[in-house]
């Protein structure tokens, strides 16, 4: 595998014999341990869950701390830092990189075109410029998408509060993943008779002010899987509760934190699925360029009864009965 750490043995013949037997397996990393770099754009529970799922699934297949050295880094929301992290991974000759969320995936792909990159929590890898197509990436990048059912999330809002007409969408226009979801929301809104009020957010420190600007202009709030907004979700929740605005979100953990509801995927399961793709590379020398991007098939209805009450909403009993998870 290219860009692996160089190592030496007592004789050149032994080196040649081992290469002949083991090919380019990453298990040949120094000290007999695999080096995996993990980078994520910001710390929030959904991304943390994806990371933990990846680590746990590899451990379940024998790649535990006795065989793997992880270098785990967080860019704290800064793209330049994400790129510096990727450069550190390359100079440190990691064998494989897990890039969590679109900005870190883009930064990492900018730095290396040879080290295998597994992505997860990336909404649209094609739109992000990471792969040539979903079916055949054509690059050193493959992995899993966290594209959530945006239309179903807005349908859920209408099912909970049919009189809703105007929905405020909080998103960072600098995140390609959020732009894709906004386009999907626009398409769905027209069919549902909803008008979207688009509220751009530049950074996490401006989330509260942006959410507050929606009060009096919208009937509900919607937060897609936007890393900037989700990292400061509590600010949106405060506004939603004070203004009695239903808050629909793009993923499960945001409901646990205090949003009202979602129909979404489970990020821990997404991380585990990504790890199984990594195993194909580690054990079978699979080429990321020919490994299709994968999606989680199952979605779940998640409700927060306490949040709904604080936002002045009475959830329909039939929805409560159908929920896969309920928080209070």
Regions found by a protein language model. Name each.
Residues 2-328:
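Short hydrophobic alpha-helices and adjacent helix-cap/hinge residues
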